[in-house]
């Protein structure tokens, strides 16, 4: 059962919590189910979806109150009692209605006789009329305003003339409703024109100046309209789509975000970008779940800029796994790390379960040192694909034990409580602070970002990823050997799974800070190639609205899972143009090996 709060409905039953949207300081909103009796499940559809108002048209015939717009449309069993009063009565008797509810009844037959019969019928429902949480609002054909006080206290009225008040009977008015078409021709797509917005805002403010809630009827019924009316302070959002409008408005808090943590973009010098010269170091940055829209949202929320978007060599990568159209991170990470497609859930193993040589193992034979940095646990699917060989990604203990024979010299991520022992057993020195990495004299060094799961930026993680990238590059460079470094911004994906726009944006901006460190390093180490991509896209993310000037983004989602869309690839440094075009995720491995001048396995 949905929690119910302050709901005064329109020809409707208002049942649901007053919902507030923190993003952009949205006011509380209520949703009105227009002509609810025409729904496949009158009352129940709106009630189950937590709507705050349910409209029922009523026509009196032969002492029966039919739920209908006109006498010619009467359906014998569809009465106000069967469709609305009886269900509401059952909910009250069951103790499920504890907050304010309003039933607004739109009279389609003659006002006074119809209202008289409504009062007679309501006498049979004392549990409703005596409830401090329930009152009834009369709309449509109404008696003269001077007669409002002749009706019981629980009977209120809908007022439709914002320019005048009914004198001493104003306390019997529950809300103000007007026809949207009298103020605008907007169809709910795009946005209101400046002139129309001025007219719309004027009538809303006029109604609010009386202390009454406000509703438009005949209003556009789209997502853009629902959001616009919420922002403008319309108290009841009019809809013929109870489920869709409720889902949209209820999720606005998680789908909208105003950024206040920025990344200063680094402008590359491009001196060695695209040049035909030797590559000594390779930095591969993987934004988990980092599709083009995730990147766009981060850019728009970051003063319309990012280090990533300074780059000139851009490609698109396909992400399908061997056994599924939509990959998981294990199969995607394996494809990037080994150049081979595999089944979902497999870590560094082929479709038959056989171990696949990964890039860190391959390069070790050619004198390279390698490192892994992630904001996931060190056994996360993407990072482990670069050192482990297990058929099942959930086998964290076995994955960690693969560190014993790995070719990794630098390891940074979460999970200290679970994995510190095996890390030390694998020959790693564990640094207390990230800055201690560069002073380490050990052959292998590890720093744990967190005892368990690495916290998100929204939950307090600071500049750990960028700092780890900077110190990690310094550590590898000090070894005086060519190196390969994989850096993962893992929690962009987590924001997608949670359908949380703010988490996507903050994690993507944080990832861009790591990109800045990599590009800056490449500018001072001319033989360094930087590649930035994703393992897959997460959530089917889109951006229906936003404001670049205020760093505000509204996101929308088609799923809580991964999708099969192509993801962007950016490259910087010698031979960066090799990464333009459209290709499979396995090609990242092959392109790197070829550019380094090695024959493959």
Give the location of each predicted region.
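Active-site His/acidic residue clusters
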Residues: 381-387, 453-454, 472, 477-482, ...
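Metal-dependent active-site segment of extracytoplasmic phospho-/sulfohydrolases and closely related
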Residues: 292, 510-550
């Amino acid at each position: 059962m949905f929690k119910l709060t302050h709901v005064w409905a329109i020809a409707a039953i208002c049942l649901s919590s007053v919902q507030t949207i923190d993003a952009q300081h949205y006011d509380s909103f209520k949703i009105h189910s227009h002509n609810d009796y025409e729904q496949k499940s009158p009352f129940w559809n709106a009630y189950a979806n937590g709507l705050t108002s349910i409209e029922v048209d009523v026509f009196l015939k032969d002492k029966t109150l039919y739920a209908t717009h006109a006498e010619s449309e009467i359906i014998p069993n569809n009465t106000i009692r069967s469709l609305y009063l009886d269900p509401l009565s059952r909910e009250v008797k069951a103790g499920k209605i504890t907050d304010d509810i309003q039933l607004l009844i739109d009279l389609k037959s003659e006002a006074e006789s119809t209202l008289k019969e409504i009062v007679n019928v309501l006498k049979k429902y004392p549990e409703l009329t005596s409830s401090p949480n329930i009152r009834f609002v009369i709309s449509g054909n109404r008696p003269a305003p001077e007669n409002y006080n002749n009706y019981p206290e629980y009977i209120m009225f809908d007022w439709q003339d914002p320019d005048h008040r009914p004198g001493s009977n104003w306390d019997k008015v529950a809300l103000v409703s007007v026809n949207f078409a009298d103020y605008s021709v907007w169809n709910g797509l795009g946005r209101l024109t400046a002139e129309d917005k001025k007219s719309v805002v004027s009538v809303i403010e006029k109604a609010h100046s009386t202390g009454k809630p406000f509703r438009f009827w005949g209003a556009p019924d789209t997502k853009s309209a629902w959001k616009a009316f919420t922002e403008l302070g319309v108290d009841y959002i009019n809809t013929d789509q109870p489920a869709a409008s409720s889902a949209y408005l209820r999720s606005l808090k998680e789908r909208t975000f105003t950024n206040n943590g920025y990344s200063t973009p680094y402008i590359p010098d491009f001196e060695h970008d695209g040049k035909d010269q030797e590559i000594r170091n390779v930095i591969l940055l993987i934004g988990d779940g980092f599709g083009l829209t995730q990147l766009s949202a981060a850019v728009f929320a970051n003063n319309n800029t990012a280090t990533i978007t300074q780059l000139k060599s851009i490609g698109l990568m396909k992400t399908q796994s061997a056994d599924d159209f939509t990959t998981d991170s294990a199969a995607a990470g394996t494809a990037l790390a080994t150049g081979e497609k595999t089944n979902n859930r497999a870590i560094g193993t082929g479709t038959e379960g056989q171990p696949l040589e990964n890039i860190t193992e391959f390069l070790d034979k050619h004198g390279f040192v390698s490192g892994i940095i992630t904001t996931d646990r060190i056994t996360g699917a993407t990072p482990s694909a670069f050192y482990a060989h297990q058929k099942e990604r959930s086998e964290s203990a076995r994955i960690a034990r693969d560190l014993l024979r790995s070719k990794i010299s630098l390891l940074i991520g979460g999970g200290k409580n679970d994995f510190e022992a095996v890390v030390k057993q694998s020959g790693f020195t564990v640094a207390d602070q990230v800055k201690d990495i560069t002073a380490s004299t050990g052959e292998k060094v590890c720093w744990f970002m967190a005892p368990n799961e690495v916290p998100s930026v929204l939950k307090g993680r600071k500049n750990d990823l960028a700092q780890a990238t900077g110190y990690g590059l310094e550590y590898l460079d000090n070894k005086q050997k060519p190196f390969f470094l994989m850096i993962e911004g893992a929690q962009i994906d987590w924001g997608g799974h949670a359908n949380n726009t703010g988490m996507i944006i903050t994690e993507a901006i944080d990832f861009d800070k790591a990109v800045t460190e990599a590009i800056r390093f490449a500018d001072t180490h001319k033989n360094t190639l930087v590649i930035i991509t994703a393992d897959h896209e997460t959530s089917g993310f889109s951006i229906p609205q936003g404001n670049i000037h205020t760093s505000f983004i509204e996101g929308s989602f088609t799923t809580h899972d991964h999708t099969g869309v192509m993801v962007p690839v950016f490259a910087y440094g010698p031979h960066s143009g090799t990464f333009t075009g459209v290709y499979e995720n396995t090609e990242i491995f092959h392109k790197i090996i070829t550019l380094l001048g090695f024959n493959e396995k």
